[in-house]
């Protein structure tokens, strides 16, 4: 255990077993470089998936995922559905842990921000009375308003996920087009054009009604597309030799949405697929998933 600034960093002294649950308890008396100390014991748990460490969702549904390395994107050599802006496949290193929500922001969650006067209304005709539906027809600007409001409500920093964080979490350790097993029925994991018809009706469905991926995230494939921080790019050629903590180009006419939505085909739901839209667009198939920076606590060095 090492303290640096206001963070306590746990580095295993030996390799951890994969697919195991571990518990860590820190006793009183540990002091960081600023002189802050624990006045009581602290305990956390996590499980390992490959070289990735995750912690169970907190009461808000936020899941802590360690940093790690993965192959981002897709190309026609490995995926016949790959589009030009998904390649080349390249190595990405995420150095820091981050929280990501296990669900898309709901109408109820977004309505609280609207009622507080900090978020503007979604596009007309989409603001359902069903508070457990994911909020849709919100722009990238509105998604950021929501994250900023969440930050103002607690001593926690909420934000949109980077595109790399999103894909890392959506893939959940897989290298296949979707994060569910290849022999699984996609309809068990996603709302998309094959199961969002009569008698189900059309439109987004209540969050967390399908199976989650291996990291515990629901609806990363289908239901709604999700805004991420990044400006869009024509491809990943600038990152072809590998990159650490990428945040996309510095400027572009569009932002990126990920994940596919309820009336799109399976190929649009692939983990690597990304769709550009202007940041003021309020599209019926786009919603929000948020990330959060960890507070002082246990960080996991796995790379």
Language model regions located:
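Surface-exposed recognition segments
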Residues: 78-92, 174, 182, 203, ...
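Blade-terminus and WD-like Trp-Asp/Gly-His loop motifs, strongest in beta-propeller folds
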Residues: 2-4
